[in-house]
Amino acid sequence: MSHAIDELQAIIAELKTELEEPKATGGVATNSRLARDRIDRMSAEVVDSNPYSRLMALQRMNIVKDYERIRDKAVAIVGVGGVGSVTADMLTRCGIGKLILFDYDKVELANMNRLFFTPDQAGLSKVEAAAATLSFINPDVEIETHNYNITTVENFDRFLDTISQGGRIAGQPVDLVLSCVDNFEARMAINAACNERNLNWFESGVSENAVSGHIQFIRPGDTACFACAPPLVVAENIDEKTLKREGVCAASLPTTMGITAGFLVQNALKYLLNFGEVSDYLGYNALSDFFPKMTLKPNPQCDDRNCIVRQKEFQARPKPVVIEEKAVSEEPLHATNEWGIELVAEDAPESNPTPTEAPVVGEGLRLAYEAPERSSETSEETVTTAPADETSLEDLMAQMKSM
């Protein structure tokens, strides 16, 4: 009897291990799916086994000069939710060198209307689940996760140090920060950190009704920071929690979040690889398919003191020299016309000189042929008409036969 109980307990323990294994790997069953081997260098070879062939084709089409430089870039993504998770997915598939993920939330079944996460990952932290999935998609990408709230005083300093020293080269800052958070407090924390360390970053968001979104490229001192023109909630110091009621949540569409994430990653790639035009602000209205673009200038009276410092530094930079093109003169290149050449408009009426006028030629030239002068008197042509003949037709016929 005791032996049978021991066998049952062993079977139960084995089943528990099998159930826990997918959770420990972020929902990826390692015994059924094996990740590919790492690739040391990107190749443009067009074969089915090359995951980078279609990306490297951008070089052949003269879109990007050196696509492999993306492996030298480090990007920090704050917020791994509806927009942030898709953003991380896209950058991973593009072969980014390093991703640093920040989030303190967990995956819930309520998140399944969005992209990326799967139901078997419910209960895991978002950064843990994302890291497991992203590593399986592209093991060449270095992924670093931070499971904490960046808005607290202690964690803000940790966040500041990470983005300042978390680049591909040890001790160097990240190349770009992407804000994919859903609250103003976190946006203000990212804004303060990037202003303090003078880091370029993208702010992004989707409206509560899920039918509009936007991205904004913020360059400290050059464009408006998030505190230069804050939303009403931030400007009035209203506690955002008071606006939320129990049983009420924001709407969410995977389409709007996917479009916003696509805009975000597209402009991030253009900035990192230096091709195309990076949009300072790009919006999206799903109801009318409207895409507004604009540039927001910094506020000289911004409440963020570091923003004021960056504005002064930007204004002190030497302005780029603009070479003005010389105006094309409409005066004739040569004042003298030695050969007597004249230009006549195509639509001008043709004017033939009268026979008595001699054509004008240059000095030292003479005409090879001169037309003879015509007499002013016109000859009259004499037209001789036969007199009327009264001979009949029969007589004429008889005369012709006798000839």
UniProtKB/Swiss-Prot annotation:
Coiled coil: none
Cysteine disulfide links: none
Residues noted as binding Zn(2+) in the record, renumbered to the chain: C225, C228, C302, C307
Active site: C249
UniProt KW keywords: ATP-binding, Metal-binding, Nucleotide-binding, Ubl conjugation pathway, Zinc
Binding annotation for ATP: G82, D103, K126, N149, N183
Record's GO cellular component terms: cytosol
This protein's record includes keyword Metal-binding: yes
GO BP terms in the entry: neuromuscular process; protein ufmylation
Region span, Disordered: 371-403
GO molecular function, one term: metal ion binding
Family: Belongs to the ubiquitin-activating E1 family. UBA5 subfamily.
UniProt function note: E1-like enzyme which activates UFM1.
Protein name as annotated: Ubiquitin-like modifier-activating enzyme 5
